[in-house]
Regions:
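Intrinsically disordered, low-complexity cytosolic terminal tails
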Residues: 1-92, 161-168
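Ankyrin repeat domain, specifically the short helix-to-loop turn at the C-terminus of the second helix
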Residues: 80-92, 120-128, 154-173, 200-208, ...
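General structural concept
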Residues: 92-146
Length: 262
C-alpha cells in the first residue's frame, strides 16, 4: 500500500507531533498484521522468556541496526515493515532479536542517541526497558554512558508510565538494575561525569547513591574519589540511612577519603 511508503524520506526533525502520530499508527498496523509462518507463531512467546545470553542466537538483521543508527524514524518503521514481510515474522519477534552482544533495538537507539526511535520502541515494547545484554546492561546503562540527558529522561519517563500496566516490570526498579560489575545506572553516571545525566538518575531514585557494586563501592564513594565538588554536593543533599552499607569496611566518605590520601 502506498501510504506505508509515502513518508519514508521525511526527516525526523519534521513537525514534532506529526511523526509520533504517523509512526504510532503504522506500528499498530504492523502489530495487528498476521504473517504466514508457523515458525513465527511458535517462537513468539518462548523468545520473551529467554535469558539475555540465550537471546544472542536471535540475531537482528543488519538493516534494522543501520536504520536505528541512521536515526530517521519513518525509515525505521519502513524497515520494520520490510523485515516482517520478508522474514514472515511478527513485529514482536523482530523486537526480541538482538545483536551479537545481546543488545536490543532499544539498547542500540540509546547508544546512538536516537531519541524518536527510542521513544517509539519504549512506547510499543516497554518490556525492552528492563532487557539486559550479555554484560547485564539495561538500555538505561547504555543511555547514561551516551551522556545524552534527553535519552535518559525519555527512558526513565517511559518506564514510569508503563510500569503499572506490565506485570513483568512491576517489581523491577530500572534505576536499581545492576550489570555484571554490580554497577547501577547511577554508578555509571558518576563514571561518565555528566552532571545533567547524574541529576536525571539521582532525582529518579536517590536511595541508589548508597548501593554497593561488586567492588564494594557506592556512587557516593565514587563521587568523593573523583573529587567533583558539584557532583558531590548534589549527592550529599539526601540524608544518610542508619543501616548504611559499608564500603571497604568503612563509611562511603571515610573509605573514599582514605583512598584519596593513599
Amino acid at each position: 500500500m502506498n501510504h506505508n511508503h509515502s513518508h519514508l524520506q521525511i526527516p525526523i526533525e519534521s513537525d514534532d507531533s506529526s511523526w509520533r502520530q504517523r509512526c504510532n499508527r503504522r506500528m499498530e498496523e504492523l502489530k495487528n498484521t498476521q504473517f504466514s509462518s508457523q515458525d513465527a507463531a511458535a517462537s513468539s512467546q518462548p523468545v520473551r522468556l529467554l535469558l539475555h545470553k540465550e537471546l544472542v542466537g536471535k540475531v537482528m538483521a543488519h538493516e534494522l541496526y543501520n536504520a536505528v543508527e541512521d536515526g530517521n524514524v519513518d525509515n525505521f518503521v519502513g524497515v520494520l515493515n520490510q523485515q516482517c514481510r520478508k522474514r514472515k515474522l511478527s513485529l514482536s519477534d523482530i523486537f526480541y532479536q538482538v545483536t551479537g552482544a545481546g543488545d536490543s533495538l532499544l539498547h542500540v537507539a540509546a547508544y546512538h542517541k536516537k531519541e524518536h526511535i527510542a521513544e517509539l520502541i519504549a512506547h510499543h515494547f516497554p518490556e525492552l526497558l528492563i532487557r539486559r545484554n550479555v554484560r547485564g546492561d539495561t538500555p538505561l546503562h547504555v543511555a547514561v554512558r551516551s551522556k545524552n540527558s534527553n535519552i535518559v529522561h525519555l527512558i526513565l519517563s517511559q518506564y514510569a508510565i508503563k510500569k503499572s500496566n506490565h506485570d513483568e516490570m512491576n517489581d523491577k526498579e530500572i534505576t536499581r538494575k545492576a550489570n555484571e560489575h554490580g554497577d547501577t545506572p547511577l554508578h555509571e553516571t558518576i563514571y561518565s561525569g555528566d552532571v545533567d545525566v547524574i541529576k536525571q538518575v539521582f532525582f529518579a531514585d536517590n536511595d541508589v547513591v548508597h548501593y554497593l557494586n561488586k567492588s564494594r563501592r557506592s556512587p557516593l564513594y565514587l563521587a568523593v574519589v573523583n573529587g567533583n565538588v558539584e557532583i558531590l554536593n548534589l549527592l550529599l543533599e539526601i540524608s544518610f540511612p542508619v543501616d548504611l552499607p559499608q564500603c571497604l569496611g568503612n563509611s562511603p566518605l571515610h573509605a573514599a577519603l582514605l583512598e584519596r590520601k593513599s
